[in-house]
Curated annotation (Swiss-Prot):
Domain of life: Bacteria
Subcellular localization, as worded in the UniProt entry: Cell membrane
Gene Ontology MF: a single term: acyltransferase activity, transferring groups other than amino-acyl groups
UniProt xrefs under Pfam families: Acyl_transf_3
Family that this chain belongs to: Belongs to the acyltransferase 3 family. OpgC subfamily.
Top EC class of this enzyme: transferase
EC numbers on record: 2.1.-.-
PANTHER family attached to this UniProt entry: BLR4337 PROTEIN (PTHR36927), GLUCANS BIOSYNTHESIS PROTEIN C (PTHR36927:SF3)
Protein name per its UniProtKB record: Glucans biosynthesis protein C
Length: 384
């Protein structure tokens, strides 16, 4: 445990917040894309589909690298049990709060919008369970994965810490090219696991809890560990914060490959396995692109940025039902996809910010949506 706090990484705080907030244009553009979603516009937009695909191809990989970085930083700062308790509370409490307050009403709304209320009684017990798993976890899946990664990383982080204490500090002798090869092989390994499951027991891939707990965790654990290694080895972080032409070009080529796979791939063939390899390496390269841009443009303290850093989780949690409401009841009345997209951003962000300000004034809601217990202020006693 370290008593000396690490210097504040303003650019990482900012990147994490903006990646979270990027979920808003991501889901609103999904309404106007060619992808089938809960609600869709009458006519899809090719450029909003392209925008949506680009965000989807890298956003969460970079997010989990930052999560791993901060998780290990705090692991060194606090006793093990306290670290685990705090980390799980910070993500677990908001997730459990959002299910009854946000995703359950969202599920009920969609049942009426999609006229499925009459079909619900005809579903089997497992079909009801699986539907609820997908719909109630919904956009909260990354919080569940963070709880799992935090628990799994106890042993990994402890091993990292012991190695730091017993070994002399030395540079991480690994280049971005070697990292690219490693992540390519990790993508192939993940694709192989998925293919084996598809051959042996394909039905399990449609199970919501299996998807969130097993498949999503397996895919994102390398990025989480990479974040911890970037904290342990400052020179590795420097590689990510230093612009790399190779990573930029590689990410561009990977995105083109991603689009081609989306266009010509087949779910019954190798589309999902190919996508996992592409997004694994593209995620790594985009860590360099995003970190280097963020380090240059966002590495400063600002009250406005701090506000959105603090508000980002709450805004992300509430934006999803607001987006679905907009798509179901407002989108059909706007003929232009561009105007609809912009109106959606204003509608969702505006209401989300109002709700954020309201929840700050209600201590119970503030605790439930942040997982942070209220700070006890010591009363000033007059001595004399």
């Amino acid at each position: 445990m370290s008593s000396v706090p690490a210097p504040r990484e303003y650019f990482l705080d900012s990147i994490r917040a903006w990646l979270m907030l990027l979920g808003i244009p991501f889901h609103i553009s999904l309404i106007y894309s060619t992808h089938s979603w809960h609600v869709n516009s009458a006519a899809p937009s090719w450029w909003l589909t392209l925008f949506n695909d680009f965000i989807h191809a890298f956003r969460m990989q970079v997010f989990f690298v930052i999560s791993g970085y901060f998780s290990y930083m705090l692991f060194l700062r606090y006793p093990l049990k306290h670290w685990w308790k705090v980390r799980v509370e910070r993500v677990g409490i908001p997730m459990l709060t959002a299910i009854p307050l946000l995703t359950l009403p969202q599920f009920i709304l969609l049942q009426y919008v999609k006229e499925k209320t009459e079909n619900w009684p005809t579903l089997s017990a497992y079909e009801k369970y699986n539907t609820l798993a997908w719909e109630l976890i919904s956009h909260l899946w990354f919080l569940l994965v963070l709880v799992i990664l935090t628990t799994v990383s106890i042993g990994i982080f402890t091993w990292f810490q012991k190695r730091q204490e017993t070994s002399k500090p030395r540079p991480a002798a690994i280049s971005l090219a070697k990292l690219s090869l490693i992540f390519f092989l990790l993508g192939v390994a993940y694709a192989a696991i998925r293919r084996i499951i598809f051959i042996v027991y394909p039905a399990i891939l449609s199970d919501g809890m299996f998807n969130f707990i097993v498949m999503q965790t397996l895919f994102y654990v390398p990025f989480f560990i990479l974040g911890a290694l970037a904290f342990i080895h400052p020179d590795l972080k420097v590689r990510f914060t230093t612009p790399s032409r190779g990573c930029t070009l590689g990410a561009a080529v990977a995105f083109i490959a991603y689009l081609l796979n989306q266009r010509y791939g087949s779910g019954d063939a190798w589309m999902y396995e190919t996508e996992s390899v592409i997004t694994m390496v593209m995620g790594l390269w985009m860590v360099n692109v995003v970190f280097s841009l963020g380090h240059r443009l966002l590495n400063f303290q600002s009250a406005r940025v701090t506000y959105f850093v603090n508000a980002s989780l709450f805004i992300y949690l509430v934006h999803h039902p607001l987006t679905l409401f907009f798509g179901a009841y407002i989108t059909p009345h706007i003929s232009s996809n561009l105007i609809g997209f912009l109106c959606g951003l204003i509608f969702v962000m505006g209401i989300a910010l109002i709700l954020y300000e309201i929840h700050l004034r209600i201590p119970l809601l503030k605790f439930l949506f942040s997982g942070k217990p209220p700070v006890k202020r010591e009363s000033r006693a007059t001595i004399g």
